[in-house]
Design a protein with these regions (language model features):
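Non-catalytic alpha/beta scaffold blocks inside enzyme catalytic domains
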Residues: 1-239
């Protein structure tokens, strides 16, 4: 799928070539980054990046600071692409910062075409991996929570939607958006941290933290994980 870490996190340790596209695993997924460093040391793994220079704890080749460099890899015009296509267990890791743009669909398409040219691509193994930064993104997409009306610049389109329809907005623990984008709407906040958007909500419904309830989660691989409650919810929080 185009939103999961398809090859599995464990398989990273077997990789002998890794292409990072718009992703900083040291910042976005430290455990995954530790596995990348491990395969770099043990397998002499070649690592190439598309994007700005990064402060990583292993050596890499910066193929291009622009996403245009993906086409050069697809057409095998770079030294790293030769390593990528000649390796036995290559993988591609794409960050959501690269695909959450107006060009995201095109970027994902090119990455998919590169993946199909890799030697280990098959019906049973997909070397193309999406590294989601939002912990609940994979589970939400698996349940079918999608809305193409907000593709591209999310906050601009959100402002347009609120200005047009004056809706009731439910914020399910969401704190990353600018609260000014919600002006003109009736905001109901469900969450447990009480960050800035909770302070501007019309109604606050406190919910338990993940440590305060037994739940089912889905990791970036799309694998189901179950947790057990450590203690009862505090204050007025309710499931």
């Amino acid at each position: 799928e185009s939103y999961k870490f398809n090859s599995s996190i464990q398989e990273v340790e077997n990789a002998d070539a890794i292409l990072l596209v718009g992703s900083n695993p040291r910042w976005e997924a430290s455990v995954l980054n530790a596995r990348i460093r491990k395969t770099y040391i043990n397998n002499n793994c070649k690592i190439g990046i598309i994007g700005p220079d990064l402060d990583l704890n292993y050596s890499y080749t910066n193929i291009s600071k622009s996403l245009i460099g993906l086409n050069d890899i697809l057409e095998n015009k770079t030294e790293f692409s030769k390593d990528l296509y000649s390796s036995k267990n290559p993988i591609i890791i794409v960050g959501t910062s690269a695909i959450n743009t107006n060009q995201g669909a095109s970027i994902l398409k090119v990455c998919g075409e590169i993946a199909k040219k890799l030697p280990n691509f098959s019906k049973s193994f997909n070397p193309l991996n999406i590294l989601n930064q939002d912990i609940s993104r994979v589970g939400s997409l698996e349940l079918g929570f999608t809305n193409n009306n907000f593709d591209g610049d999310f906050e601009i389109k959100l402002k347009e939607e609120i200005k047009k329809n004056k809706p009731v907005v439910f914020l399910l623990g969401l704190d990353e958006i600018n609260f000014k984008s919600l002006d003109g709407s009736f905001v109901i906040y469900l969450g447990h941290h009480g960050d800035i958007n909770a302070q501007h909500a019309d109604i606050i419904l406190p919910t338990p933290a993940y440590t305060e309830k037994s739940s089912t989660f889905m990791n970036i691989e799309g694998r189901v994980i179950q947790t057990s409650r450590c203690h009862h919810p505090l204050g007025e929080a309710k499931e």
